Each structure stands twice: as structure tokens, then as C-alpha cells.
Amino acid sequence: MGKKDRQRKKLREFAKLKNRQRNLRKSVQTLKNEVQREAKVPRTSNQIALGNDKIEEINENSPLLSAPSKQEEVSIPKAVDIDTIDAQPLHEGPKIDDSPQDEVNSIKGKPADKANEDDLKPPSQHEACGNSALQSSITDFSDRSVSPLQSITSCNTPMSEHELPVSSSNSFERADDMPVVQADNQTSSSKSLHIVAPSPEVPVSGDEITSYGYGSIPQSIGDVENGLNPPYVENTSSDELVHDLTRRRIFSSCMCTYLFFIAMDSSIILVIASKIASEFHELWRLSLVISAYLLSNAIGQLVFLKLSLISSVKLLLCIAQFSFILGGYLSWSSAHFWTFIFARCVTGFGGGSLIALKSTIMNRFSQKNDSRYSLSASMITFAMGVVIGPFMMNLFDSSHGSGWRNAFLIPVPFCLVNASIMLADMYSVKSTLYGRPTPTLWKRFKNTLLSPDLYEILTLTLFLLCFVQVTSLDLTGLKNNTMIQALLFSVIIVCGILFFLIETSDTYMNSVISMSLQGDKRLIWTMIGISFCFAALMCIIPFGTTYFIIVLNLSTLQLAERLSPFFFSIVLGYFSVSYFWKSKGQNFLLKFVLSGATLLLYVALMGVSLNLPVWKQYICLSLPFLGSSMILTLLSNLYHEYHEQRKSPISGSIVYCFGAVGGTVGISLGGYVFHKTLIKLMHEKVMPFSKQGYLKKDLLKIIKHATESSDWVHESAPKFVFQTLIECYLQACRNVFKLSTLFFTITVVAIFIFNRIHCRSQNCLSLS
């Protein structure tokens, strides 16, 4: 008997016990109704004893419903613990110490003194209360003939960061821990006793449903445990339950596969950016190759976080998958530099969109208590993609330097299979995706267009685009270049001011990407620390690999081996802080020790030389990356802790998004420093060779070729100037490492200011 057969057998046995329990509870309720009706008529002591004997006889015959301890005590009912009920073994039921009537009242969420009054009401009132709009909407999600995405991807119920229910099954749970979920498609009356499902919803009045609120979705399982949920019955066979859990696991696997290939694609572009730019003879535009990817990645996350409020998730998933697959194909087939830049923009937009959708959809599939395990699995998957990327690139590397194109084509067939599986699951049942827009949908769309989010996205996009153009493009050769530069700088300043005003305005406190600057000052300093830490990483990783490739002349296999410790840096950096760091403890000294040690590693990176020992090649990038990973995890946890509770489900995507924004600024400034330093040093050190009899015209050609392609330096550069050119590259990399040290210093200052604000707030709370 296989594992699946044993699971089905256990589920069938459990379903039989549940049905028996339901029938016995109905019998108890019927008997109690008779007792209540007879209570109005004076009875003798023999009749009362006979009724009590019947109740005890029924309770003794029930293996799932225990008898009450004291029948005379009818006091405040105890709330039913849903997790306890579902966690009981199959051969024994939940232990309930209250009387059967109190048990009924506790399941319904009513006090004991009001239960009798409700029983005297006509059945029509109970039916009206039971048949709520929320209960009918849950039926779609509980219907196992429908795909698990049908209820969350319908255009009538678009997914947003404010509508993240707690699911009954974790996407990364073990196969042995399968919860039993049952469905009900009929309205239940108050005369029947119901079984509480693992994940019921919380009814909320219409006044509480706002455009930025959770609406009728419970914020935590505690709301359900407090008795606020309406009872409903669910009936589903064990085969359908196993099939539904299999669907959810398949979907979670597909999303993690996308995350793996996104990480692999990102690592490839970060590692061989200088090699790609050299092949296109655009080495001085090295930063543009990476900044275009990071910029489109951040914009994709912001846009899809907003579109998820007004559009169907099915459509958004299709667009995101198509963008990522198309970008990989264009990266493989691009023959010109600007075509490749466009391909990286498409890939980055698709990757950012998939990350935004994954962070929100996976929160629906996993319970709040299990979100840490889901995030841990995602971090391990991401780390594996980062490490495997350079090794996959080495498989297709050739002596001509064009093998890196095939590395971008690797994710395409796997992503096509993923897309086919997800689309077949989503569109297996007819939905209302192409239905007519309702007035509610149009009103929501109109309110979304008038919300501050789109203005924030627009101003931030213009700010980053102009910033990338100023730092990555050569505007000196254009006519009226002074005017163009002044215009771009003006746009940068205006967009920055507008973005700051939108974020600090009290009117726009409810925006999706708001950092809540007016709400808690600690949030802005955590976000500044995250952004500048990403900026520091985006300086040392691309230009650290540039140092390995150009200065040390390492092969792609040797480069992949030097970067293999990055996996342990990511995993250890995340787990050491998330599982062993007390987030609310007074760990100020430990924070500064970690920050100071990481800052010293950044300073040590500035002293790299032409001949670096092999053991230092393994740790010169991995150790600063480890410290930065720990700092990023710490700041991210602090941001989640102090962010508004109703926005916590999307705070992870917001952190990654603004990290990408900081990385865009960091790589742009790093590329600008690298290019300017390289041009200046080559003119200072190469042109003096004219005194030795070399023509200035030939020396200028050497400088031009050296700034356009590092491959030309190693293959065709004259021997008399080769060592000088390598020294110029080394000094340019050192200057970029100095810039990364400055960025990380700002991160340390942000942590210091955060701790000062935190200490003041704690002192104020203690005094009050």
C-alpha cells in the first residue's frame, strides 16, 4: 500500500468518525430541544431523571463527543480551538469539558445567556443570518471541483495586499500533515449542529470594508478562535482533498521554480556583466546592463502590487510569465547592445512581477504561523539559484566568448512547462474573467487611478530613469549637452521632492507602497538602511567579479568556484538572524559589533592587489556578503515588526522593491565612478608613452579600445602598455569599493539613528 493509499484510508476513516460525531450531536440537540420544551411544563422528579439518563447514554456511546463534567453548571462557554480539533488523532476526538449546550454556543460564538433567546426565534431569522454573502463567497474557495486559484483569481474578487486569508494548508507542509477540509454548498439552519472548518472567515459589517482594509477577510486565526465566525458545514471526499492538496503543492512548486530561475538569471547578469559589455564593445556602459534589469524589476513589483487591486490575478500571472520567458529568449537572440538592454528590461519586469505575485499568493496558501517556513524554503531556493547560475554559464562558455547567451535560454523551456501547468490549473473551470465590468469594479478602478500609488510609481520611475541616463549615458557628444544635463538634473530633483511629499502627506497614508513616514520614524530609517545596503552590494558584486575577470584573468569556472560560498552567505545570513536573533531584545551592542565587523570587511576590500592569494579570493566577497545579508535580514525583520499590521503581508515585497531601487542607484553611481576613473587614469598613464616614440594617435586608439572592451586588452593590447592598463582597471575597481564602503557607512548610521529613536520610544512608554 502506497503512501497516498494510506493517506486516503486515514481520511476516509476520519470522515466516517466525523459523520458519526455529527449524527450524535444532532441527536443530543434534538433531545435538548425536547427537554427545553418540557421544561415549561411542571415535571416530576422521575421524568427529570429519565431525561438525564438518556443524555448520559448517548454520551457514553459517542467516541468523539465526551460527556459533560457537571450538568448543573451552565456558565460562560469556552471557545473551540480549531487547531486542537484538527490535531487530534484519528482514533480519538477532541476533549470538550463543557456541556453539549455550551458546546453548541461556543461553536456559534454566542454567550450562554443569549443562546436560549436565539433558540426561541423563528428559523427564518437563523437562515437569513447563516446565508451571508461571505459564506457564499467561501463556497467557491471550498469547492474542490474548482482550481485552488479560482476563488482568488476571479475578477470579482481581485487579489490585493489587504485581502490575504489564512489558508488551511501550508504550501510547504509535509505530506503526513494533511488537514481535513470540508465544503458546504447549502444553507444551514440553527437547529442543526455544525463542525467548524479549519479556516472560516470573519463576518464584517459594510462600514468596516474600506478600499484599503482587509474587508471580510480575517486578519489572524485569533479572530476565528474568539467565536466571530459563522458556522457552516463542509462535505468533501478524501480523494478530492488529496487532489486539492496536490494542486496546491504543484502550484507552490511552480512558483518556487520561477524564483530559482529568477535568482539564476540575476546571478548570471551580475557575474558576467563586464564580459557581456566587453563583447558588445560597451564596457564603459557596464552599469547600464545591470541597472536596466534592477530598474525594471522594481517597477514591475510596484505596478503589479497596484494592478492586483483592480485586475484578475490570472491575467497578471499570464503577463508576468510571458514577460519573463520572452525576456530570456530575447537575451539569447540579441545581436546588438540596445536589443540586449531591452531584453533585460523585459526580463526584469517579468521577474519583479512574479516575485510580487508570489509573495501575495503564497500568503493565501500558508498559515500565518507557517509563513516563516515558507520564507525559509524560498530563501534556500533563491540561494541555490544564485550559486548555480555561474556554473550553468560555464557549461556554455566558449573561447569566442559568446556562450553566455545560451545560459539565458536555459530557463525558457522549464518556464514554459511551468506556465502550461499553471494555466491548465487556473483555466480548468470556466470563470468570470471575461465577464462584463460591474459598477463596483469600475468604481474600484477609478479610485485606484486617483490613489497616490500611481503617482508614486510614476515619480519614482522618472527619478530612476533620469538618474540612470545621467550616470550611464555619454551626453558629452550630443548637441546642447549642457541643456540636456540641466533638464535631467531638474527632473531628478523635482521627482525626488514629489515622491517625498507624497510619502509624508497625511492624505496618502494608505498607499500600497507607503513607508508610513508620518506614522513611525523608525520605518524610514530601516528603509534607508536597506536601500543603501543593497547599493553597497551592487557595487562590490559586479565590480568584484570585474576585478576577478579583468585584473586576475580568471576563467568562468574559476569565477563560479570563488562565488560558491555565496550560498552559505545567504542561508547563514538569513537563518542566523531569523531563528537565533531576539528581534525585540536590547541587542544594540551585538548590532554594532556586526555592523562594525562588516564595515571593516568593506574597508579591507579596498586593498585588493594584482596578486591576490587563492584563499583570499574565496573570502574577499563572500564575507562582506555574509555580513550584509545578516544586516539586510535584521532590517527587514524590524521593518515587518514596525510596519502597519494590515500591510504586513506585502511588506516583504516592499522591502525587496526598495532594495532594488537602492541597488539601481548604487550600480549607476558605481558605473559612473568606474568609467570616469578609468578614462582619467588611462590618459594620465598611457599618454606619457609618447615620449618613448609612440604616436599620440596610436595611444588614443589604445585608450579607446581599452575602455570599450577588456577582451581586447587581454588578446590584442601591446605588451608595453598591457600592465599599465591592468593597473588602471585595478584602481578603478578600488574606487568603486570605496564608494561601496561609503554606502555601507550610511547603513550603519541609519541603524544607529534607529536605535536612538527606539530607545526614546521605549523610555516614553515606560514613563507613561
Swiss-Prot record:
GO terms for biological process: basic amino acid transport; transmembrane transport. GO terms for cellular component: fungal-type vacuole membrane. Glycans are attached at residues 480, 553. GO terms for molecular function: basic amino acid transmembrane transporter activity. Residues 274-282, 332-334, 397-406, 469-481, 544-562, 609-617, 675-734 are vacuolar. The chain crosses the membrane at residues 253-273, 283-305, 312-331, 335-357, 376-396, 407-427, 448-468, 482-502, 523-543, 563-583, 588-608, 618-638, 654-674, 735-755. Keywords: Amino-acid transport, Coiled coil, Glycoprotein, Membrane, Phosphoprotein, Transmembrane, Transmembrane helix, Transport, Vacuole. It is a multi-pass membrane protein. The modification Phosphoserine is found at residues 62, 99, 106, 160, 192. PROSITE patterns: MFS. Residues 9-40 form a coiled coil. It is found in: Vacuole membrane. Disulfide bonds: none annotated. Residues 1-252, 306-311, 358-375, 428-447, 503-522, 584-587, 639-653, 756-768 are cytoplasmic. Residues 110-121 have a biased composition (Basic and acidic residues). Residues 132-159 have a biased composition (Polar residues). Residues 34-172 are annotated as: Disordered. InterPro entries: MFS, MFS_dom, MFS_trans_sf. It comes from the Eukaryota. Belongs to the major facilitator superfamily. Transporter required for vacuolar uptake of basic amino acids. This is Vacuolar basic amino acid transporter 4. The gene is VBA4.
